[in-house]
Amino acid sequence: VTDPHLDHLQPLHIDAFCRDVNAVEADVVLLGGDIAVARNIREILRMLDDAIAAPIHFVLGNHDYYGAGIDRTRARVAEFTRASRRPTWLPTAGVVQLTPDTALIGHGSWADGRFGDYERYDLMLNDYRLIDDFIRLDRPERLAKLNALGDEAAAYLRDVLEDAVRVSRRVILLTHVPPFMEACWHEGRISTPEFLPHFACKAVGDALVSVMR
């Protein structure tokens, strides 16, 4: 499941969502980010943990940081998951062994501005208005921040993927941001050069390819 944006729902509708998830009778549930926003991400994760039968493994998406800063949100989520039996926030878990042959790894990643044409198009996303780290940045500073966040995700995933392939024949990667532009689609086609800088992470794609070769 990805991008449920459960902060838009009333509790009874979140309960209905959880019932639908339980009806699948899955062995595990993977949440691919954009679960809520910063002010209620922990509350909603707690609701999901209470209501969903299967173990939950998740990453964060950009919307999960809305209304706060990246480091603060990550710290609060890490604190919550340390204190809970479940769910599992994958960037703090390393390699999760689902079966003897299958490993799970994950990181929300971040669009790094390297695909498409960042310089040509002055696109202002809500991310840059609603996440503290971006609010006061000009365009060059914003690109540098996107590069840094993408590089951080790539470094983590390169290391954890190397660990995973040493012990497992199959590796499942959960991420929020597409690591290849061919996987970044909008309205039935690959996103345009205007949008690609803000919706895909080249650094992560390069890291994955370098390990798997």
What residues fall within each predicted segment?
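Active-site environment of divalent metal-dependent phosphoester hydrolases
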Residues: 6-9, 36-42, 63-74, 94-98, ...
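N-terminal active-site segment of His-dependent metallophosphoesterases
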Residues: 1-58, 65-73, 133-143
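Short amphipathic alpha-helices and their capping/turn segments at secondary-structure boundaries
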Residues: 18-21, 46, 89, 95-101, ...
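Active-site neighborhood of phospho(di)ester-bond hydrolases with catalytic His/Asp-centered motifs
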Residues: 1-2, 29-34, 57-62, 88-93, ...
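Glycine/small-residue-rich loop that forms an oxyanion/phosphate-binding "nest" at active or ligand-binding sites
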Residues: 69-91
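Conserved beta-sheet core of the metallophosphoesterase superfamily
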Residues: 49-50, 55-58, 101, 179-213
